[in-house]
Swiss-Prot record:
It comes from the Eukaryota. Probable homohexamer. The gene is Hex70b. GO terms for cellular component: endocytic vesicle; extracellular space; nucleus. Residues 159-428 form the Hemocyanin middle domain. Keywords: Cytoplasm, Glycoprotein, Nucleus, Secreted, Signal, Storage protein. Belongs to the hemocyanin/hexamerin family. This is Hexamerin 70b. Pfam families: Hemocyanin_C (PF03723), Hemocyanin_M (PF00372), Hemocyanin_N (PF03722). InterPro entries: Di-copper_centre_dom_sf, Hemocyanin/hexamerin, Hemocyanin/hexamerin_mid_dom, Hemocyanin_C, Hemocyanin_C_sf, Hemocyanin_N, Hemocyanin_N_sf, Ig_E-set. GO terms for molecular function: nutrient reservoir activity. Residues 32-153 form the Hemocyanin N-terminal domain. It comes from Apis mellifera. Residues 1-21 form the signal peptide. It is found in: Secreted; Nucleus; Cytoplasm; Cytoplasmic granule.
Length: 683
């Protein structure tokens, strides 16, 4: 429930020669009104007649058939009406995009919303759908439509952990929230401005009953971080797997983007494992017992518990047909990489070792809408999740209980997720290994040398984070909801802001692209690992353009300026309040041109009290304006690509010569972990 509150934010500034800044934009009244109306659609979708009951009359008077001419995609309107006539997924049932029939219905609903010719038609359709389709399907289709419609560009969705808190918080805290909503006010309550506030401690899985045979539970603070899981939810909205690129004017990079983003997430997880004295992510075999168990303590909104997977469990017999399908798809994809081509749906050979080859490969591995032959190469990604998640299915239509791996919001919580993508990324590495290594000419920047790299002291800590739970419980009335605020308080990993100080010498005035990576210095046994054998485990931290002048250049880049990160989401109640006061003209409303990104708090692994060694690698490369491509993403905002591969130069096996070039520099850093009370800083 939205409650009017006020909050302020401090934005830090730092100096850089040329920064790809993320500017804030000033919203006009139309934007503010639309953003406010959209926000309201996400709240209490399971009780649409109770929350904002005035929308009920709007829904009753809207008729899809009478508005047929107000949609560009009339086929979608007609198909949706047929689905509705013959029975769609009922309200109250569990929804997952990884179920074929549910996915089809959600896609048709999205097409209906997306093709509305005007915002008013879109909004009226969304209001109508809020009362008439499955709640979770509605939230998914509405989210994708808001992100991709031109007239809602850069409008924010409420944080999904406040829209669907049952998918981000354990059942223990949700049960306490239910009790409060039902009148149990035994917990501490504070009243301010006639609003009753409840603050509930939220723990991570395993705090009560630790599974000693699941060492990955030590990482729950990372894998269950609500900001990280919200990031992954949004990642899958940038290029929804079901969409065709040309239908929404996507740039032809989604396959490469799929590999790169999952590589980033996997490498970040590995860095966190090292902070906890754990080694590389292990592979998982479908033909042997699965060593990593998963014991979620979460429930779906209708009360069904998430499936669990026992430690050492084997794939059940009824899933064996899918295991064989996975083996077949693996063979076909691996063979295609070796042969250098895939076969499209017309029987034509599509070469892989071309400029678009990696994109083609990523599309067939994911099995997305751009796959050249989904019948031959299938949907390996979804199939492996289905088998390893141990979700429940029955022969009764719509009776499914998806696993954590089968929900975008919960995928990262299961440690097997990272084993899955370690295997999937083997296709990426195999492909890259078959390419020629970078030559000295491709890596060098003549006349430019990095003289030194220093980084501020790196300090991490856990601090409190509060998140609203109201939307996960039933409300008695709109008025009661307005006067109640239930929040979960949780410890989350954070770090002090830090700055890279890079001194670069140039013999001329020239533009350069700076890339910064963070990777392991030692393995879990304390053995030093060299870059040549460990290049694939580095996470890219940042990239930005600089104008180098002739002579010495001091570049300073703050951690919060990274093109990959964003600060924590503004709480829903705070943002809604800003919209309310902006709509009446009392204040100006500003919004970011980069709506989403990786959580800035999680840039650094936890480290250790005495300091955990890692390597920072800095590369300065020539920047040629003629090769620049600007890509506008509805999720990540505008980014500049200089024509090089994502993750360059660590996307390919590293030649030892990389380390002797003057425009490449490796620096050891220590990441120190502190208790919050140890920090001599005002937080």
């Amino acid at each position: 429930m939205i409650v009017i509150m006020k909050a302020g934010f401090l934005f830090l500034a730092s100096l850089c020669l040329l920064v790809q800044a993320v500017p804030n934009k000033v919203a006009d009244k139309t934007y503010v009104t639309r953003q406010k109306n959209i926000y309201e659609l996400f709240w209490h979708v399971d009780q649409p007649t109770v929350y904002h009951p005035e929308l009920y009359q709007k829904a009753r008077t809207f008729n899809l058939v009478e508005n047929l001419d107000n949609y560009n995609d009339k086929e979608a309107v007609n198909e949706f009406m047929q689905l509705l006539k013959h029975g769609m997924l009922p309200r109250g049932q569990v929804f997952t995009m990884m179920n074929k029939e549910m996915r089809h219905q959600a896609v048709v609903l999205f097409r209906l919303l997306y093709s509305a010719k005007t915002f008013d038609v879109f909004y009226n359709t969304a209001v109508w759908a809020r009362f008439n389709v499955n709640e979770q399907m509605y939230l998914y289709a509405l989210s994708v439509a808001v992100i991709h419609r031109p007239d809602t560009k850069l409008m924010k969705l409420p944080p999904m952990y406040e829209v669907m808190p049952h998918l981000y918080f354990n059942d223990e805290v949700m049960q306490k929230a239910y009790n409060i909503a039902m009148g149990d006010t035994a917990d501490m309550k504070k009243t301010y401005n006639n609003i009753d506030y409840y603050l509930l401690a939220a723990n991570y899985t395993g705090w009560y009953l630790t599974k000693h045979n699941v060492p990955e539970q030590r990482l729950n603070y990372f894998t269950e971080d609500v900001g990280l899981n919200h990031f992954y939810f949004m990642l899958n909205h940038n290029y929804p797997p079901f969409m065709l690129s040309n239908s929404l004017n996507f740039p032809q990079i989604r396959g490469e983007f799929y590999f790169f983003l999952h590589k980033q997430v996997l490498n970040r997880y590995y860095l966190e494992r090292l902070s906890n004295d754990m080694g590389e992510v292990s592979y998982v075999s479908l033909d042997h017992p699965i060593p990593t168990g998963y014991y979620p303590t979460m429930r779906f909104r209708n009360g069904l518990a998430f499936p669990q997977r026992e430690t050492g469990a084997t794939v059940p017999l009824h899933m064996q047909k899918y295991v064989q399908m996975i083996h077949d798809l693996h063979t076909r994809i691996s063979t295609a990489i070796d042969l250098g081509y895939v076969v499209d749906s017309y029987g034509n050979h599509v070469k892989l070792y071309t400029k678009q080859g990696l994109n083609v490969l990523g599309n067939i591995v994911q099995g997305n809408g751009d796959s050249v032959n989904v019948q031959l190469y299938g949907q390996l990604d979804l199939l492996v999740r289905k088998v390893l998640g141990f979700g429940y299915e029955s022969n009764v239509k719509y009776q499914v209980v998806p696993s954590a791996l089968q929900m975008w919001s919960t995928s990262l919580r299961d440690p097997v997720f990272f084993s899955i993508y370690k295997t999937i990324l083997d296709y990426y590495h195999k492909y890259k290994e078959n390419l020629p290594k970078y030559t000295t000419e491709e890596l060098n920047f003549p006349g430019v040398s990095i003289e030194s790299v220093t980084v501020d002291k790196l300090i991490t800590y856990f601090d409190h984070f509060e998140s609203m739970l109201n939307n996960g419980v039933s409300i008695q009335s709109h008025a009661k909801a307005k006067n109640t605020m239930i929040k979960a308080r949780q410890y989350r990993l954070n770090h002090k802001p830090f700055t890279y100080h890079i001194v670069v010498n140039s013999d001329k005035n020239v533009k350069g692209m700076v890339r910064i990576f963070l990777g392991p210095k030692y393995d879990e046994f304390g053995h030093e690992v060299d870059l040549v054998h460990n290049y694939m485990n580095f996470m890219q931290m940042d990239e930005f353009v600089v104008n180098l002048k002739s002579g010495s250049n001091t570049i300073e880049r703050n951690s919060h300026e990274s093109v990959f990160v964003v600060p924590d989401e503004v709480p829903s109640d705070v943002l809604y309040n800003r919209l309310v006061v902006s709509e009446d003209g009392s204040e100006t409303f500003k919004y970011s041109s980069q709506p989403y990104g990786f959580p800035e708090r999680l840039l650094l692994p936890k480290g250790k009290k005495e300091g955990m060694p890692y390597n920072v690698l800095v590369v300065v490369s020539p920047f040629d304006d003629s090769n620049v491509v600007q890509i506008d993403s509805p999720v990540w905002g505008r980014h500049i690509y200089d024509g090089r591969a994502m993750g360059f130069p660590l996307d390919k096996p590293v030649d030892p010569l990389l380390l002797v070039l003057s425009n490449i520099h490796v620096k050891e850093v220590l990441v120190h972990h502190r208790e919050m009370e140890e920090l001599n800083v005002a937080l």
